[in-house]
Structures are given as structure tokens and as C-alpha cells.
């Protein structure tokens, strides 16, 4: 799976491409920081305007909106370009995988579900990595940029449970996010979601293989297909009930998450020690930090799918390696026999 980063043929795409993607994501985060500052200034201006008629001019108001449009336009442009480039980067990664599978396909074709691994799982791997990989890197960059901002905004503000401790908001976001993530990771492990997804794909592969065989083999009876499809049905129904339990916990937590920043800011809001602009900056920065910390929580279903794809591809590659070892052993034995026969003739 990772020959893309080891094969000299792909070094330029692998390492220069990765550098371009990382740099572009960093620029996106920097623009996001500027947008967060804009929210503070804009809502302070709104508060000033609502407190006293004509405290601001219409020109100042339009200028502020234009400033946001400029920042948003830059963000959109960078996001679109990095998305486009990432697509090409990941297709090259998939190509590196597929080329190796093609080179050993005379052996790999003997493995059950080989065609599905080479075609379906490689495209799944690249698509999941597109969304999951870039979002993980962006989440880490957001933490690096927004945590100092949240520290600065927290100074001198009373926080629920933590009082005026300057690290209250960051620690609150950390505890809330880690607590929720651990809860759902534990729930996913208890429900064995990765295993269920893996079993589901194996049953589907067996059913598909029998359908392909049935196209050319008249001895395959409908009853055989029905039995296989019954196995597919059972594993699907099991996955539905498992994900039902998981989604109850995940969605309930995400809904409660909407109020978390307001709960921690309750003493400061009631005491009136923050302006509307500062409150918006804090809530947005808190949301960005919290959202990054909850990356695993929000991406958990996709992570489960990626883990399942990774497990199948690793198993597939292990079987190919085993076949190559067996073939090498046979080749060695055949050479040994030839040399022995030659030796006997000489004597």
C-alpha cells in the first residue's frame, strides 16, 4: 500500500506533492485565523451600532463585509486548488498500488476476491484518504494555531467550573472532546464495528465470486446463490443494528456539543465582562479547537471503513508474499533437481 513512497519512480509526486498539500493546508488555516479576527471586529461594530444610532457609518459597514468577502474568496480559491491537486496526488498513489498488483497478478488471481481488492479496495482507499488524510492534517494545524488564540482570549474571563483560571477554556474543550471520543471509541470496540465491516465485505466478495462462476458454470444452482445471499443479508442486518446503537451515542453527543462553549462561558456572559465581538471570537476559536480534538469522533465511521479496507489489502498482500515465497522455494527445488540430475549423469 505504501510503495508509492518507496518507489523512486514516484518520489517526485510522493514527496513534492505531499509538501504542496501541507503548505496549502497551512495557508488555509492562516486565512481561517484572519476570519476569526474579523468576526471579533465585526460583532463589536454591530454591538456599537445597536447601542447608539449612527455610531458607525454605512461605508464602514460595507467595508467590513467586503473584507470578509475577500478573505472568504481567498479561502475558497485555496480549498478548491488543494482539493484538485489532492485528487491527482491520490490517484498517483492508487496507480503505484495497482501497478504492483498487476505485476504479480498471475499469482494474485488465485486469491479469493483478488479482482475486488485490486479494483474496488484501491479506489476506496484513495477516496477515503482524500477526505480523511487532509482533514486530519488540517485538524492538527488548527490546534497549533487556535489554541494560543483561545489561551489569549481566556485571560481574565470567569469560566464555568474553572473560575478565572487562564487555561480553563482549553482544558474544558480538551476534557469534553477526549471524554466524548473515548466514549465512542469504546462503544465502537464493544460493538466490534471494524470486524462487522470486514465480515460484510468478505461475504459480499464470496457472493460476487459465485455470481461470476454461475455465468459460465451451469452446475451452480440458484439454491447455492440463495444460501450465499442469505449470509449477506444476515451480516447487513447485524451491521444495521450495531450502527444504530453507535449512532445514538454519536449523534446525541454532537447535539450536546452545540451548547458546550456557551456552558463554559456562562459566568462571563451573565457578568457582562465580554463584548459581543470577543464572545464570538471565543466561541468560534473554542469550536475550532474542540472540532479538531473531536476529529476521531466525527470521522469515526470513515475511520472504521478505512481500517476495514486496510485490513483486507494487508491480508491480500500477505497472501501474495506467501505465494511468492512458495514459488521461490519451488524454483529453488527445481534448480536443485536439475543440478542433481546433471551431477548423476557426469558420474
Give the ranges of each region predicted by the language model.
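Membrane-water interface at transmembrane helix exits
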Residues: 32, 40, 44, 48, ...
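Short cytosolic helices in intracellular loops of multi-pass membrane proteins
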Residues: 93-111, 186-231, 290-297, 306-318
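Alpha-helical transmembrane segments of polytopic integral membrane proteins
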Residues: 32, 36-40, 83, 98-102, ...
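Transmembrane helices of ABC transporter permease
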Residues: 17-26, 133-195, 264-267, 271-274
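Membrane-integrated ABC transporters
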Residues: 1-32, 41-68, 82, 86, ...
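An intracellular "coupling" helix at the cytosolic face of ABC transporter transmembrane type-1 domains
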Residues: 124, 200-207, 211-260, 302-305, ...
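Helix-loop-helix
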Residues: 152-178, 242-310
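Transmembrane-helix motif of ABC transporter permease domains
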Residues: 8-31, 51-92, 162-187, 276-290
